[in-house]
Structures are given as structure tokens and as C-alpha cells.
Regions:
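Positively charged n-region of N-terminal signal peptides that target proteins for export
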Residues: 1-5, 21
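Bacterial N-terminal signal peptides
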Residues: 6-15
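Bacterial Sec-dependent signal peptides at the C-terminal "C-region" and cleavage site
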Residues: 15-23
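N-terminal mature ectodomain segment of secretory-pathway/periplasmic proteins
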Residues: 35-36, 41-117, 145, 149-151
């Protein structure tokens, strides 16, 4: 439970539909162009374009459903998530544990789970929500981050990736890795914040698919504290759907019987 509550937001938002673009029409990646990307700002702008930043401007809401598994514990469950106008709602259902929910209505954040009950998100947790729930458009990074630093090219699996350290206006730094060929985001390192403290988390994004002109990672694999593996596989992603505004608001406390 500690792991789930600490990484719930990071997993859901970082692996949510990323604002992206239509793939290049050339027969093979223009490596000569990629080689000219020498600054963090240039890479972030190029990545946003490659993943569909133009199409993302037409998106007002996104609703996603996914399967969630924690192999080491033999846990398999379901997850649903809604993002609209910088508001966020997520629900994870795990057999034997129950429902884990988290929400943000644009100002206030809250969480509810079988162990901690219903509570407000404050301090570092709330700052994390505010940072991650905003549009994931790399070209717009200056609205969410105060600093972007190019660390160089790193190997992520079999791919070569630009490593960029992004420092939010509030909260700790994150390192994002962009494939040098596709410019897609393929890994994110961050320290997730939860009710029990801070937990280092590595999230790998893959199985990108074109949805409404945007490239969306349909699979994420997260390594928590270097040992625990959490896999999320999206089964359905829909954009510009009607959203019930009430789901973002903190639930009322049920009277004790």
C-alpha cells in the first residue's frame, strides 16, 4: 500500500496521453537534424512537435482505462483516469486491497484509500499534483519548470536518449529521457511523494500509438525504490468526451453508523 499511494499520481499522470504530433513523413529518421539539437530548449520543443503539440491544442479532456499489475505481489487490477482543464481524477481497483482514489479540482487535491481514509493533499504532495496535472507539452516547459539542463545522451534499453533534468517551480527535479531518433519520451525519473514519504521511481514509456493526432504511450513500466515493478497497460483512451465535473471534487465524509 505504501508503494501504491506514493506513486499513484506519478504513474497515472506521467503515463497519461502526452501532447504530441504527427510522425515525420520521411522514410527514415532525419538523424542529421537530430544531431543539431544541442540545447535542452531545442530538444523539448522538437519533442513536443514530434509527439503532437499541434493536435493537442484541440483536446479539452481525456479519459483513459488501463490494466495494472504488480508481478512480485501477484496483484492485478484496473485503473481509470480523467484529465480536463488541469483537473485530475484517478481510481485504482485492486482485489484484496480495495479502491484507491486521487483527485484535483484545480485548487484542492485529495486522496482516499482503505488504510488512510479520505485526506487532503498538502505540501509536497499537492505541489506534485499541480506540477504533473498540467499539460504535458514539452514546448511549454517554462510554464511548469524553472530550469532545464541537458545532461547528455544516455542509453535507455537499446535506445539512445537525450537526458534532460527539469526542475519544477515547486518540488524536486525530474530527469526526462527522449529517444534521439523519434524524440518520444521513453523514461522519466522522479521522486514520488506520498503520505509515508519520498520514493524514487523510474518510469519507462513504450508502445506509442497515434490517437487523434497525438502519440500516446499505451504501456508504462515503473521501478519503485529500485526493486518493485508496476506495469500499466492502457486499453482505451478517448479525447474530448463529456466529463462529470463532480468527480474532481473531494468526496463528502460518510457519517459513521
Amino acid at each position: 500500500m505504501k508503494i501504491l499511494m506514493s506513486i499513484a499520481l506519478g504513474l497515472a499522470v506521467l503515463s497519461s496521453p502526452v501532447m504530441a504530433q504527427k510522425p515525420a513523413t520521411t522514410k527514415k529518421p532525419a538523424m542529421s537534424n537530430v544531431a543539431t539539437l544541442k540545447t535542452a530548449d531545442a530538444i523539448l520543443a522538437a519533442s513536443a512537435k514530434a509527439m503532437g503539440s499541434a493536435a493537442s491544442e484541440k483536446i479539452t479532456s481525456s479519459v483513459a482505462k488501463a490494466k495494472m499489475s504488480i508481478p512480485a505481489n501477484g496483484l492485478n487490477g484496473e485503473m481509470e483516469m480523467t484529465v480536463s482543464k488541469e483537473r485530475f481524477y484517478m481510481k485504482q481497483s485492486l482485489p484484496g486491497i480495495g479502491d484507491i482514489m486521487q483527485g484535483f479540482d484545480g485548487k484542492l487535491g485529495w486522496a482516499k484509500d482503505p488504510i488512510n481514509g479520505l485526506r487532503d493533499l498538502e505540501g509536497a504532495e499537492l505541489a506534485q499534483v499541480k506540477t504533473e496535472v498540467q499539460n504535458q507539452m514539452a514546448s511549454d516547459w517554462k510554464k511548469r519548470y524553472k530550469k532545464a539542463e541537458l545532461l547528455g545522451v544516455r542509453k535507455v534499453g537499446t535506445a539512445q536518449a537525450y537526458a534532460i533534468r527539469l526542475t519544477p517551480k515547486t518540488g524536486g527535479p525530474q530527469t526526462h529521457y527522449f529517444d534521439t531518433k523519434t524524440l518520444f519520451l521513453i523514461r522519466t525519473d522522479m521522486v514520488a511523494v506520498g503520505p509515508t514519504g519520498k520514493i524514487p521511481t523510474e518510469t519507462y514509456l513504450s508502445d506509442y500509438r497515434l490517437v487523434d493526432g497525438m502519440q500516446i504511450p499505451f504501456k508504462t513500466r515503473s521501478i519503485v525504490s529500485g526493486i518493485q515493478e508496476v506495469i500499466i497497460t492502457y486499453t482505451d483512451v478517448k479525447n474530448n468526451v463529456a466529463v462529470d465535473d463532480s468527480i474532481f471534487k473531494k468526496p463528502k465524509v460518510e457519517p459513521k453508523k
